[in-house]
């Protein structure tokens, strides 16, 4: 897909008046494939106060790709999305962009492209992923387990009412005895798995360090991190398996679109930010419980 990131991100660093304070890039392995991971921090003027205890790190954007420049551009785009979310989700304009319906960042994307559809397509797939995950967990979408080409990794393919998106959850038992997951949506089953595998690999790396260190008594501040930790345990994975085995008698139909449009702001200088909000089957995914498979 056509991108002009090299042009739009040329003055992105704080030293040039931009919103990005720091970009770090390192080589990594994703199931034996050489890739690069970039982590980005926003500058102090546009970031929230850092949380006191986190296990996934206090970065604002992450990107993983075989090409280091692309990984950096992906991480910058994610940080810009985060900037827009933090600025708008609690503002007086929040209702205009569907944050009264879904106060999470679901259905958001940032992309330094030339045309609206480039960013919208990413936001739409993000919305499909999150909607499908919630509907499946609530017993309103069927799922079937499929093998994958990655050793030890299974995939749950979630049936969706959308023509343009396939949603999956990939999962794996990891040493020394925890479970890691990744979920994504894309145009095909294989493409969705490829995206989700990167998320699984990141989670596996962080969770292995956490559990090999013996865990900690202090609870993470972030609800989604607490959920990720819970479902990495044997108890959490058993709850996940119970949901995989549940019968679905009345699948949810195609949901109403609450919002589908651009979120303008100072970030538009660098990238377009788009959001698609699909009416979720419930708002229970935002309740303060660790026993909900959504993060």
Where are these regions (language model features)?
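Helix-coil modules at protein/domain termini and other flexible surface or pore-lining loops
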Residues: 1-295
């Amino acid at each position: 897909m056509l991108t002009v990131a090299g042009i739009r991100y040329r003055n992105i660093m704080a030293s040039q008046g931009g919103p990005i304070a720091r970009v770090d890039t390192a080589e990594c392995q994703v199931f034996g494939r050489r890739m690069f991971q970039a982590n980005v921090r926003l500058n102090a003027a546009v970031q929230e106060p850092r949380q006191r205890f986190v296990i996934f790190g206090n970065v604002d954007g992450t990107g993983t790709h075989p090409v280091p420049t692309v990984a950096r551009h992906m991480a910058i785009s994610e940080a810009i999305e985060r900037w827009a979310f933090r600025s708008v989700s609690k503002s007086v304009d929040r209702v205009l962009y569907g944050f009264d319906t879904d106060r999470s960042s679901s259905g958001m994307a940032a992309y330094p492209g030339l045309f609206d559809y480039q960013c919208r397509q990413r936001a739409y797939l993000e919305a499909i992923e999150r909607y499908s995950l919630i509907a499946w967990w609530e017993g309103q979408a069927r799922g079937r387990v499929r093998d994958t080409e990655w050793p030890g990794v299974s995939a749950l393919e979630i049936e969706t009412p959308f023509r343009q998106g396939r949603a999956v959850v990939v999962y794996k038992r990891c040493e020394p005895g925890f479970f890691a997951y990744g979920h994504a949506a894309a145009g095909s089953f294989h493409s969705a798995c490829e995206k989700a595998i990167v998320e699984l690999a990141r989670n596996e790396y962080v969770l292995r360090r956490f559990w090999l260190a013996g865990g900690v008594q202090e609870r993470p501040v972030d609800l989604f991190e607490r959920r990720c930790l819970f479902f990495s345990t044997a108890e959490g994975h058993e709850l996940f398996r119970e949901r995989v085995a549940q019968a679905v008698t009345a699948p949810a139909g195609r949901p109403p679109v609450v919002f589908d449009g651009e979120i303008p702001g100072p970030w538009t200088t660098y990238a377009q930010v788009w959001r698609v909000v699909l009416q979720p089957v419930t708002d229970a995914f935002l309740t303060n419980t660790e026993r909900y498979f959504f993060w």
